[in-house]
Curated annotation (Swiss-Prot):
The record marks R20, K27 as: Transition state stabilizer. This is 2-C-methyl-D-erythritol 4-phosphate cytidylyltransferase. Catalyzes the formation of 4-diphosphocytidyl-2-C-methyl-D-erythritol from CTP and 2-C-methyl-D-erythritol 4-phosphate (MEP). The gene is ispD. The record marks R156, K212 as: Positions MEP for the nucleophilic attack. It is an enzyme of class 2 (transferase). GO terms for molecular function: 2-C-methyl-D-erythritol 4-phosphate cytidylyltransferase activity. It holds the Pfam family IspD. Its EC number is 2.7.7.60. Belongs to the IspD/TarI cytidylyltransferase family. IspD subfamily. Disulfide bonds: none annotated. It catalyses: 2-C-methyl-D-erythritol 4-phosphate + CTP + H(+) = 4-CDP-2-C-methyl-D-erythritol + diphosphate.
Amino acid sequence: MSQSTNQIIAIVPAAGIGSRMGAEVPKQYLALNEQTILGHTLDCLLNHPQIAQVIVALNPEDKHFCLLPQAQHKKLLTVTGGNERADSVLAALQQADENSWVLVHDAARPCLSHLDIDKLIASTSTFPQGAILGAPVRDTMKRTGEHGEISNTVCRDRLWHALTPQYFQAKQLKVNLRAALAAGAKVTDEASAMEWAGVMPGIVSGRADNIKVTHPDDLQLASLFLKNLGR
């Protein structure tokens, strides 16, 4: 399933409100190094030479996106997202060429590098079924009981943190994501929908600084990483 002759489209589900940040605006619009988190994310995707289009799924009540300098970019298209990430991704897939390949990337991962995108795109020679960026688990992992006590230590061999982008053939992802949701499957990312359908995606080792801004402390870290990337 080669993508060499088909265009590559980036999908950014950005309809969430990011309540864990405790901010007055959705977290993707928080200021970060003289622009917004989402602005940094979009710059990376829009400026990549192999990405033909970027589709952003927005909350229907969104009043912030139109103020971004990236909002009028010729490669950018917006759609109305849904209540859950999977709903937003499906809405974006409805507008994507079914023959394309899609890179689905979290709005709140502003430190993505072009090098990681290149590695993921190139991975189809090894993983024609699609792949995701990941980072090997480095710390000792513990599972707890219902009261917070440690119940056991989890073996971290071959254990990975799932990152984004996640890279799949558009039609296959749309079919499997829709079927998984209809079956009531728990879909936490695109790879989980593919796994549910019996497709086992590959994992490509990505940079550790490709963090997701989830808590207030993450902003400081993301700022440092972006400066190191020259952004």
